[in-house]
Amino acid sequence: MNSAEIMADLSNHTPMMQQYLKVKKDYQHALLFYRMGDFYELFFEDAHLAAKLLGITLTHRGKANGNPIPMAGVPYHSAEGYLARLVKAGRTVAICEQVGEVTGKGPVERKVVRILTPGTLTDDALLTSYQSSNLVALCIHQNQIGFALLDLSAGIFKVQQQDYKPEQLPIELARLMPSEILIDEDLVDPNIIEQIKKHLDCPVTKRPNVDFNLNNAQKTLCDQFSVSTLSGFGLDPLPLAKAAAAALIHYAKETQKTALPHIRSILLEQSSDFIALDPITRRNLEIIEPLFEHGTSLFQLVNDCQTAMGGRLLSRTLMQPVRDTALLDARLDAIEQLIQGYHESPVRLVLKEIGDIERVLSRVALGSARPRDLVQLRHACAQIPFLRNALAPVVQAKKSKLLGQLDQELGDFKSLHQHLMAAIVENPPVLLRDGNVIAEGYDAELDELRQIRDHAGQFLIDLEIKERERTGISTLKIGYNRVSGYYIELTRAQAEQAPADYIRRQTLKNAERYITPELKSFEDKVLSSESRALAREKALFEALLENLRENIAHLQMMSSAIAQIDVIANFAHQARLNNWARPEFTPETGIKIQGGRHPVVEALSKAPFTPNDTFLDVQHRMAIITGPNMGGKSTFMRQTALISLLAYCGSYVPARAAKLGPIDRIFTRIGSADDLSTGKSTFMVEMTETSQILHHATNQSLVLMDEVGRGTSTYDGLSLAWACVVDLTKRVKCLCLFATHYFELTELGSEPGIDNYHVTAQELNGNLILLHKVQQGPASQSHGLQVAKLAGIPANVIKEAQKRLRILEKQQQQHLQTSVQSDLFATLDSEVTPSTQVIEKVIEVEVSSPALDLLKQIEVDNLTPRQALEQLYELKAALNS
């Protein structure tokens, strides 16, 4: 049963259900949490969906068209856990609260006060400490695209606009880490949604075209920032960025049901400001999330930030390494100064005492702050002088401009701290409605109301004594209940002695209850004092929030400074703890790492980690790495990328020394897996990733390629791997680490720009000892059977494999004696002049081969991935014919 189907005729429903259906009509896209007393209830299709997603009981309430109305509900006091699960599942939830007073005349007034979506969360109960809630909007027009990002929980707002290249979209979105993406429902290409969902696990929300209106965007943003022009933000020539930003403002106001006073500025970014990392590279390097459930990511390893906002800033820093070496050196100077004077420890001790004020300030701005939020803010203000004292030796030395600047941005909030100390009790309740939040002595009117409320007991005792003396009835009692209010109780036998001013209120089996004008006056005063005191507390609390909102810009600056100091101190702590070194930057192309280590593997390994050197430059762009499985090839490649990444995040690095030139992108082609969702085989996935690298890598890119070509036949795979090495070296000219089991590739080591390396291993008494040391030169053998033995392959299988290996090696030797070695790899294009000759080599085929004829007919640039795979099968069939 669908609520929309029964909206046509509301007359057959109860007043409560009529009210529900009218509200639901405006929120068809959301699960409506409808407040009913101490529960949130859901009806019709919402009830079915909630019962399924939350595992709660599906029941019914009333009927519609003769059928029971499905109903499910959750307790109000524990709703946050259920809300978190629904939002995590990508659902939108509308919270409908009781806002009116119970009058007995029809249902109490209700309205939607907040809409929860994955990209608009600010409540700690709905977010983990290190999780950002990033709302991202896209605006595409012709060959341009505008991005905008809004993190309501942190007050972060930024935009960029650039040429639209579909293949670049996943890279930019992965850097922004969206929790929810907004798109124009009228203009977007369906393929874009498909591409987003392929690479990112976040909902895509279609919004009305008017939200993205280019003409209205300027006014929307000017109104938000209270300015007459956006030229100061650098947005004038960027209409699509402005349109995307305006769409975010519309959506945020709609979901929060309030203004956004903490969104006071906007930052313009350029994609060229950052090192590009596509989703595959982020996953392979395990930057934020580990590849496997019980693994450890780089973020998990290095995150020992003392504040939640510092942890979130660290996560953003790792996801978007910057290319501005002046900014990086400023960070490194700050780290160096903290390390040299052992200053990071006292700084971190103070930071540990500071709560998540970044999110507190967002809730203050949105009007959803709770009493304990202000206690957190009060305590943070109290810690600022201690934090500045801990930084003082470094600031006074004037060797770190960044720390000096951050020290100033911390500000002085002594007066605010004193104000909050006077206003809020030491340990307030969770909710304002529970009362006793405002401290005694802060407000005279509130103190008077509390006096009446709190001293009611003594008044009643005194009145009871007085009435006993007046009536001479020693058993007279004064009491109270919620139904009757205050009363004087006499037994039936004594009721005849009741004075004339006793007004009968209630008759019981054995007693009569009365009220007097004096008791009635007291009752009115006491009962109203409770509600009036709570109303006064609410007004005072709202006034506090308004006062804080007026100072929100300075408070946000303080919060941002704390987060930055926390990240810098954390990097200093990691450097000291793990013996990391300060990296150097050079304008010359290259990567030179001495004694490099993989930070995660080193930290988790029980055995000492074997450090290795990396050397790549314009004369040595390609390193072909051979050697046994488990020998450390993948670890070596990943550590090179992670060291480069950490350096460009402004951190010290796990190495004895590191010197890095410009890097615009990091690519990885590591590991193998089928993509069952799209029907792609392991080899097809491998080739798709390889194609991305060949098309988009530049001479400033760092490329890691592991076992290219292993997903197909030996000769096909070898030929492809060979061609990739040649293309990356001669045309792309990137810096590349290329691990392979194709020993034939080591022949390329004699070509300019290509060097051979191998991971060392030794055999001792038939056992393989992996030394994990990378040395120059090709590997002498693969040690495949020894690795299989280490993996626990049964002895009889190893023995059979050894027999087969000897047979194959003998056959290969016989073949080599009867063939011309120089014909194995023929130059692909004999017409190229020697100075520019490409050294791609493939298995030689006869000139009249059907396969060669078919190959000549293929238009490579126009092939889709599926067509490419079909052509491969046709080529193989032609070769076999």
UniProtKB/Swiss-Prot annotation:
State the protein's purpose. This protein is involved in the repair of mismatches in DNA. It is possible that it carries out the mismatch recognition step. This protein has a weak ATPase activity.
UniProt cross-references to Pfam families, sorted A to Z: MutS_I, MutS_II, MutS_III, MutS_IV, MutS_V
Q: What NCBIfam families does the record point to? A: mutS1 (TIGR01070), PRK05399.1 (NF003810)
Q: Which GO terms describe its molecular function?
A: ATP binding; ATP-dependent DNA damage sensor activity; damaged DNA binding; mismatched DNA binding
Question: What SMART domains does the record point to?
Answer: MUTSac, MUTSd
Its BP terms in the Gene Ontology are: mismatch repair
Gene name, per UniProt, is mutS
Which keywords does this Swiss-Prot/TrEMBL entry list? ATP-binding, DNA damage, DNA repair, DNA-binding, Nucleotide-binding
Q: What is this protein called?
A: DNA mismatch repair protein MutS
Q: Where does ATP bind?
A: 627-634
InterPro entries in the record: DNA_mismatch_repair_MutS, DNA_mismatch_repair_MutS-lik_N, DNA_mismatch_repair_MutS/MSH, DNA_mismatch_repair_MutS_C, DNA_mismatch_repair_MutS_clamp, DNA_mismatch_repair_MutS_core, DNA_mismatch_repair_MutS_N, DNA_mismatch_repair_MutS_sf
**HAMAP family given in the database record:** MutS
Report the domain of life of the source organism.
Bacteria
Please give an example of a GO cellular component term from this record.
cytosol
What the record says about family reads: Belongs to the DNA mismatch repair MutS family.
Cysteine pairings via disulfide bonds: none
